[in-house]
Design a protein with these regions (language model features):
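Alpha/beta catalytic cores of nucleotide-metabolism and tRNA/nucleoside-modifying enzymes
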Residues: 1-48, 193-205, 212-244
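Conserved N-terminal beta1-alpha1 strand-loop-helix module at the mouth
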Residues: 2-109, 168
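Catalytic cores of alpha/beta
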Residues: 95-106, 157-168, 197, 201, ...
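Glycine-rich phosphate-binding active-site loops on the catalytic face of alpha/beta enzymes
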Residues: 86-90, 110-124, 171-186, 208-244
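Hydrophobic faces of well-ordered beta-strands that scaffold small-molecule active sites
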Residues: 29-37, 61-64, 82-90, 115-117, ...
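Conserved, mostly hydrophobic/aromatic
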Residues: 34, 72, 107, 150, ...
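Active-site-adjacent beta->alpha loops and helix N-cap segments on the catalytic face
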Residues: 64-83, 94-99, 122-142, 156-162, ...
């Protein structure tokens, strides 16, 4: 291919175009990163700073416990640049379906855009798939127009159990799955691949407990569409800086 010669003005314009293109790519990646703020010690000042960072950086979401939803909705303001997610029955999923449904409705009333609900792990381990399916349907009905994501705690599941719960979720119309809460360790890349192989394009996969930009890129390459991290602002800033 013949090399194209550019004068100084054209070269400047070309470099500016590349910079903008790189920045757009970085911003799109940052929009896939969600800020996890579900530690028991997360206080008001940390939540306020987190919401400011999430708005400024245009992160994908701020993920909090139900008791922080109203406060974060206030901190994010009337024109938020990020979404607000409530993590229900975190991290063990041991609440009854009735309690989970009530918590989902309350979180939506308080201002969340999406809810993440942890699966009833014990029911999965016991093979009570009827309970799992009924719960998924009840949660789907409770969310109405709001988005629903199911945390499947894949580290606790055997391969056959993982396949089964993913299939049930997809059949119930659930369009987003979270690999794990992080309470039992982060999801390995082969688990992301395994989930992707089951759900195909029916569900978006959220890979959690990602701590570095390299890990973000690896998880996305494995099929994840969303990233959860306690280090979301730092990762986002590094991503944007690399695009300059």
């Amino acid at each position: 291919m013949e090399e194209i010669e550019m004068n100084e003005t054209e070269l400047q314009q070309f470099n500016e175009y590349k910079r903008k293109l790189n920045l757009q790519t970085a911003e799109a990646q940052v929009a896939k990163i969600e800020y996890s703020l579900v530690d028991a010690t997360t206080n008001k000042s940390l939540l306020k700073k987190a919401c400011q960072d999430a708005n400024s950086l245009k992160l994908g979401a701020v993920c909090v416990l139900p008791n922080a939803v109203r406060l974060c909705s206030h901190f994010l303001g009337s024109n938020p640049q990020t979404s607000l997610i409530a993590c229900i029955s975190y991290p063990h999923g041991g609440d009854t379906t009735k309690i989970k449904v009530k918590a989902v409705k309350e979180a939506i009333k308080d201002g969340v855009d999406e809810v993440e609900v942890t699966v009833p792990v014990a029911c999965i381990k016991e093979g009570d798939w009827g309970y799992v399916k009924r719960e998924f349907k009840a949660l789907k009905k409770a969310t109405k127009k709001s988005a629903l994501r199911i945390n499947i705690e894949c580290n606790l599941l055997a391969p056959a159990e993982l396949t089964k719960v993913c299939n049930i979720a997809a059949d119930c119309g659930i369009t987003s799955l979270r690999t794990s809460s992080g309470f039992y360790g982060s999801a390995k890349s082969d688990m992301i691949t395994a989930i992707k192989n089951v759900v195909k394009d029916k569900c978006t996969i959220k890979a959690d407990c990602v701590s570095t930009l390299v890990d973000v890129e690896a998880a996305l390459s494995m099929g994840a569409g969303i990233i959860g991290s306690k280090n979301a602002p730092d990762i986002a800033r590094l991503c944007l800086k690399a695009a300059e």
